[in-house]
Design a protein with these regions (language model features):
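Bacterial N-terminal signal peptides that target proteins for export
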Residues: 2-13
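N-terminal targeting signals for export/organelle localization
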Residues: 2-4, 18-82
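C-terminal cap of thioredoxin/glutaredoxin-like
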Residues: 28-48, 187-255
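Extracytoplasmic/secreted envelope proteins and their assembly/folding machinery
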Residues: 38, 42, 46, 53, ...
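A short beta-strand-turn-helix
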Residues: 84-102, 126, 216
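Structural alpha/beta surface segment adjacent to cysteine/selenocysteine redox centers
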Residues: 105, 116-190, 195, 220-225
């Protein structure tokens, strides 16, 4: 057997063992190979994967699992280092059970279709569980109308209180349609039995601006770039997840 042929067989066997058994000790230091060995190794890799395509899928799945684990670990560190601003900022609306043993925080944008889809399911989760404290973080990222809607919602909380905010928040998801302008939002609030003009007058206050700015800064620290994003325990859940998935995550956090 020639040296290249022997090297190819040797590398193929080692590659198979390494990929299927995950044994680091069997892996090669490719940088120490001679040119013929390196070329033979490349051919061995290609040949092995062509003959065993399922192995490649296993490798990809393992890499994705490792990346997910690393992401989760990194997210946990981010949440723990920002816990006070996430769970006890003193200005975000708090619903559900104020004394609940688990707090679920949601970053939202009223123009986000997945936030709208998640809204009714989150409410069902909170209501049926009975032991969840639910916090909403206004995080407008989809343009000027998103900012206007969040300004109005925060102003409703500051001017008219938590019940008014809850009406606006729920109404913007379930009833309001069309352009989100201050005038139309004020009229909508009036239809809900609120003082729409007074709320609109508070939209541009420094206090409202500070809430939105603080939420933006918090989202940056948490590396949140989209909505909805949920935080519970030391975990971040990025994106929409159906109700049963949310329940599973709640159970996992509770242990």
């Amino acid at each position: 057997m020639t040296r290249p042929a022997f090297a190819q067989r040797r590398f193929a066997l080692a590659l198979a063992a390494t990929l299927t058994l995950g044994t680091p000790a069997l892996a090669f230091d490719i940088t120490s190979m001679t040119q013929p060995e390196s070329e033979a190794f490349g051919e061995a890799v290609r040949g092995y994967l062509m003959e065993n395509p399922g192995v490649l899928m296993e490798v990809i799945a393992e890499l994705e699992a490792q990346q997910a684990e690393a992401q989760s670990s990194g997210d946990s560190a981010l949440v723990l280092s920002n816990a006070a601003d996430i769970y006890e900022d003193g200005f975000s609306w708090v619903g559900g059970n104020p004394e609940g043993s688990l707090t679920v925080v949601e970053f939202i944008d009223y123009r986000c279709g997945y936030c709208r889809k998640a809204h009714s399911e989150v409410l069902e989760l909170v209501e049926t569980d009975g032991d969840i404290r639910y916090i909403v973080k206004e995080f407008p990222i989809l343009g000027e109308e998103s900012v206007i809607a969040s300004q109005f919602a925060v102003a409703a909380l500051q001017v008219a209180g938590p019940e008014a905010y809850e009406k606006i928040n729920h109404g913007l998801y379930t009833e309001f349609r069309g352009a989100m302008t201050a005038e139309r939002l004020a009229a909508f609030a009036t239809d809900l039995g609120l003082d729409g003009a007074a709320i609109a007058a508070g939209m541009d206050s420094p206090e409202v601006a500070k809430v939105l700015n603080d939420n933006q800064l918090l989202a940056q620290r948490l590396q949140i770039e989209g909505t909805p994003t949920f935080v519970m325990g030391d975990q971040l859940l990025r994106g929409y997840v159906p109700l049963e998935g949310m329940r599973a995550m709640v159970a996992d956090v509770r242990g």
